[in-house]
């Protein structure tokens, strides 16, 4: 079974051509002006053997793209600009290689002599090269997967087939697998946090470069190769002549369009393809009796979510109107896609009743069509699809106000629900299947039917989110104006609960129709009304979840239930109106360390509320809880954040199992490790036992969306790993229950306590640390950059008032990445381990504790993933580069005190990590990632050096320091460094 499944998976791969490798004397020169050329013949290369041989095609692509960029740089800016870029690159390499102080002085002199225009050109060159290198790397990942498949290699970790084979090897039955899918729900949720640093125009150009680069892996004639190079040169030129930065801050509508572009390039086709492949693999690995190997359709367990247009936490520009606009644009995108696919099917399904029979239902569907052309009298499939198109066009007009791109043949009634459209397509599918047309049904038609199951008329569910303080203020005003309670906010928690529960049972509303409420209260009420409106218009799946940021008490949840009641979305179950129920699930978001620790108690109180069991029943006996990785990290540090999340998840699982309620966890993961980032596959597999249970939602944030989903093939792989990991974590949970788990957890608790102390002492208790952070990172410049529609800080960032506590976690992490310390991803671990070992006393006891840590690394996925992510962060960090940022702090005493502590902790962390893993080199167990990161340094480091120089100029206060070109240079460097690190916030 295993071999046949692997063979069939291999047969689906695209063949690649073999070409001779480049001469061994050619060494990679990953620079914007790399002069080492590469043959312009077909670059389809099947490599085997050494890592260097496997990476040869990647090196060739990087050299090739670097040469094109160098040519464009010479052409557009002159030879002198090209030589300047090369000199800076070579000097930065010397500085990196051995911390060469002479190289540092040369860099200082060189960078200071650059004019503002020269600086901008140099920054742009290195930034664009980082983007081009990322494209080459993505293409190489795709290439290597095809090579593995062609070679008949075993399925790769993270693949669906590997997950299914593992489940089969563990003795899982086909029935158990099907029960898993029946109850499963997996939802990636796109968000629009202010880490999206790339313009859509740049992304579009990069997609075309990626397509052309992939084209070079196919057999091309000489003329085709020449044309390919010409087009690539044109698009690189287009990049150079396209403004990289936005001149104005993004509006929410822009963020909506950016997100929708990923549906058009990736999700609409790749998600149905993912289902198809999964169904085929299930049929192969778990064949059903009498099914003859035919795939059985799976339920629509994998869907998409979005915060864009519904996330009001800290963003005053998200209103009821933006929610309506987001829903309308989503419907427009999916309906337009359906219309195009139906039109294409009409051209494809040309079967004639003179040659083949059709079903009675298909004939009836054709008869209902407004198409009565005699030319198509014997083509019922075409007539039926013309009718479907007409109804869908009417639906599009009704839901979006837009006409279909192609006019319908005649009038037809609109579909009221997506299920009606799906039923019509099923008639077509069944008729084809019954009359020797299975192959026709299995192509575009089957994918379209699956898309309707997944996307409906809404495309993606939009979550609503707001901070709990706003809800409290809104409810307080409603109660005061209604004469119910004049000082709600001053009540004790117990009194708030009593009042809110009483109001939820009252049939009357608090809202007065002719009263003018405050702007905030009116806006909040409008959001709830808009939610009810779009649910009625586009279907209930358009808005299903309401996230409450900073949930600290049970009343925070009850307030949102009351606001739903005011909008007609809560049924209290009295007066014969049926059982209680919420239209939109109320979901707490626990963010800080203290909130995480209180989460089990709050959820226990919620589940114990009188009558809440009826609400749960209406929700399918499920309740979701969201966990915040970002704020917990900023609050308590990397190690403590991860450990508190782990403990909270276990406590919630135990609570929900005891209550007989299904728990679904929503992971608010960011792009950086400090915000829960890192490889999704390992992150899901390392979740505590029993916490996944077939259901998971997780955020996909910032420009991480671009790196994961801009390339359709990369996007498909990322979607696949989410499903595979969820399947494995649910069906093979014993892998995360190693022997000695209690001992491991006790050790983690001790480490967490020590790490928490070290982190809090540095960040919140060190005098002047706030000033050091603002001086040595580009945090204020990031706040000024037009990254997203949401402000970077919850409060104005003036020097006297600003506090670390008030800074959002996203720019906090973004800033540490820019200065190459990436502190939120590692600080505190080294001293925590050292202190725990020292507490053991004797050398023998210390050795025993170190042995425990080694076993934890080898046997416990949670700890192994934690160390793996930290290893990756440390490999991207650079103390030499960071030391140059430290010089931006003018207070010498403060600078030396803080940076010396950070440096010492960094060195100690590297040492203890090596002692635990047995690896002296960073990423020794992941050489592909190690080489990838190493390849970026020659163009990443110069951007950091340039950024430091630009920050010096900008902050100097000298004449011209606030020049627009200096500001633009800083912003360009931020963009390029984020691209080079392949994550931002």
From Swiss-Prot:
Residues 1-17 have a biased composition (Low complexity). Its cofactor is Mg(2+). One of its GO terms (molecular function) is phosphoenolpyruvate carboxylase activity. Residues 1-55 are annotated as: Disordered. It is an enzyme of class 4 (lyase). The active site is at residues 193, 634. Its EC number is 4.1.1.31. GO terms for cellular component: cytosol. It catalyses: oxaloacetate + phosphate = phosphoenolpyruvate + hydrogencarbonate. Keywords: Carbon dioxide fixation, Lyase, Magnesium. It holds the Pfam family PEPcase. InterPro entries: PEP_COase, PEP_COase_bac/pln-type, PEP_COase_Lys_AS, PEPCASE_His_AS, Pyrv/PenolPyrv_kinase-like_dom. Belongs to the PEPCase type 1 family. PANTHER family: PHOSPHOENOLPYRUVATE CARBOXYLASE. This is Phosphoenolpyruvate carboxylase.
């Amino acid at each position: 079974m295993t071999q046949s499944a692997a063979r069939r998976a291999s047969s689906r791969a695209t063949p690649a051509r073999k070409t001779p490798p480049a001469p061994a004397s050619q060494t990679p020169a990953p620079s914007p002006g790399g002069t080492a050329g590469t043959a312009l013949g077909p670059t389809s290369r099947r490599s085997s053997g050494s890592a260097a041989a496997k990476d040869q095609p990647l090196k060739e692509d990087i050299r090739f793209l670097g040469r094109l960029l160098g040519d464009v740089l010479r052409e557009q800016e002159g030879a002198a600009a090209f030589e300047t870029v090369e000199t800076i690159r070579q000097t930065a390499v010397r500085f990196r290689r051995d911390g060469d102080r002479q190289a540092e002085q040369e860099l200082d002199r060189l960078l200071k002599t650059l004019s503002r225009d020269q600086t901008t050109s140099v920054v742009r060159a290195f930034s664009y090269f980082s983007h081009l290198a990322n494209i080459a790397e993505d293409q190489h990942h795709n290439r290597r997967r095809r090579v593995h498949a062609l070679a008949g290699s075993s399925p790769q970790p993270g693949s669906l087939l590997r997950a299914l084979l593992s489940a089969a090897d563990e003795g899982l039955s086909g029935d158990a697998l099907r029960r898993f899918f029946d109850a499963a729900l997996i939802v990636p949720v796109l968000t629009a946090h202010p880490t999206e640093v790339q313009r859509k125009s740049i992304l579009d150009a990069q997609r075309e470069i990626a397509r052309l680069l992939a084209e070079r892996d196919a057999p091309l004639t000489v003329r085709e190769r020449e044309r390919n190079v010409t087009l690539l040169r044109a698009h690189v030129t287009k990049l150079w002549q396209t403004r990289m930065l936005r001149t104005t801050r993004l509006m929410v509508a822009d963020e909506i369009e950016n997100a929708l572009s990923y549906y058009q390039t990736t999700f609409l086709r790749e998600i149905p393809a993912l289902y198809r492949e999964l169904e085929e693999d299930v049929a192969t690995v778990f064949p059903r009796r009498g099914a003859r190997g035919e795939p059985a359709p799976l339920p629509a367990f994998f869907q998409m979510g979005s915060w864009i247009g519904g996330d009001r936490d800290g963003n005053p520009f998200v209103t009821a109107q933006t929610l309506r606009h987001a829903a309308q644009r989503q419907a427009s995108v999916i309906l337009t896609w359906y219309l195009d696919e139906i039109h294409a099917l009409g051209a494809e399904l040309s079967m004639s009743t003179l040659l083949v029979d059709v079903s009675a239902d298909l004939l009836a569907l054709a008869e209902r069509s407004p198409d009565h052309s005699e030319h198509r009298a014997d083509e019922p499939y075409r007539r039926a699809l013309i009718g479907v198109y007409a109804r869908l066009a009417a639906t599009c007009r009704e839901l979006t106000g837009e006409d279909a791109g192609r006019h319908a043949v005649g009038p037809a009634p609109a579909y009221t629900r997506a299920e009606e459209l799906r039923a019509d397509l099923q008639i077509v599918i069944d008729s084809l299947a019954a009359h020797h047309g299975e192959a026709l049904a299995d192509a575009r038609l089957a994918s379209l039917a699956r898309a309707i199951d997944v996307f409906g008329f809404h495309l993606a569910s939009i979550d609503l989110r707001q901070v709990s303080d706003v809800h409290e203020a809104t409810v307080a005003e409603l109660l005061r104006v209604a004469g119910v309670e004049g000082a709600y906010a001053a009540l004790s928690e117990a009194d708030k609960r009593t009042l809110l529960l009483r109001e939820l049972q009252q049939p009357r509303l608090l809202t007065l129709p002719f009263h003018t409420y405050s702007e905030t209260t009116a806006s909040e009420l409008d959001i709830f009304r808009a939610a009810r409106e779009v649910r009625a218009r586009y279907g209930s799946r358009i808005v299903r979840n309401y996230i409450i940021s900073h949930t600290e008490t049970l009343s925070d949840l009850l307030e949102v239930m009351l606001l739903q009641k005011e909008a007609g979305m809560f049924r209290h179950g009295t007066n014969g109106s049926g059982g209680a129920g919420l239209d939109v699930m109320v979901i707490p978001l626990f963010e800080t360390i203290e909130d995480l620790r209180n989460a089990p108690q709050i959820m226990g109180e919620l589940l114990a509320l009188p009558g809440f069991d009826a609400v749960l029943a209406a929700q399918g006996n499920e309740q979701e809880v969201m966990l915040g990785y970002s704020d917990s990290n900023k609050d308590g540090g990397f190690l403590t954040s991860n450990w508190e999340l782990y403990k909270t998840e276990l406590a919630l699982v135990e609570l929900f199992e005891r209550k007989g309620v299904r728990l679904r966890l929503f992971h608010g993961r960011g792009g950086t490790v400090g915000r829960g980032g890192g490889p999704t596959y390992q992150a899901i597999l390392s979740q505590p036992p029993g916490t996944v249970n077939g259901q998971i939602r997780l955020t996909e944030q910032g420009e991480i969306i671009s790196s994961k989903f801009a390339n359709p093939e990369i996007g498909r792989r990322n979607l696949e790993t989410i499903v595979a990991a969820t399947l494995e974590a649910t069906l093979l949970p014993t892998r995360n229950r190693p022997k000695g788990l209690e001992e491991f957890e006790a050790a983690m608790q001790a480490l967490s306590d020590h790490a928490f102390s070290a982190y809090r002492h540095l960040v919140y208790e060190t005098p002047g640390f706030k000033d050091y952070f603002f001086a040595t990172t580009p945090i204020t410049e990031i706040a000024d950059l037009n990254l997203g529609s949401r402000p970077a800080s919850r409060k104005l960032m003036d020097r006297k008032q600003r506090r670390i506590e008030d800074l959002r976690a996203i720019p906090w992490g973004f800033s540490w990445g820019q200065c190459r310390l990436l502190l939120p991803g590692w600080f505190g671990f080294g001293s925590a381990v050292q202190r725990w070992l020292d507490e053991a006393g004797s050398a023998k006891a210390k050795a025993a504790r170190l042995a425990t840590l080694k076993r934890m690394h080898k046997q416990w996925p949670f700890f192994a993933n934690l160390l793996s992510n930290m290893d990756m962060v440390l490999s991207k960090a650079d103390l030499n580069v960071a030391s140059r940022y430290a010089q931006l702090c003018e207070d010498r005493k403060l600078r030396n005190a803080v940076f010396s502590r950070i440096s010492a902790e960094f060195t100690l962390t590297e040492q203890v990590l090596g002692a635990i893993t047995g690896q002296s080199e960073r990423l020794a167990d992941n050489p592909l990632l190690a080489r990838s990161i190493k390849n970026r340094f020659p163009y990443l480091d110069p951007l950091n050096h340039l950024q430091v120089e630009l920050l010096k100029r900008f902050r100097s206060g000298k004449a011209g320091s606030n020049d627009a070109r200096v500001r633009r240079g800083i912003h360009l460097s931020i963009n390029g460094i984020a691209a080079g690190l392949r994550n931002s916030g």
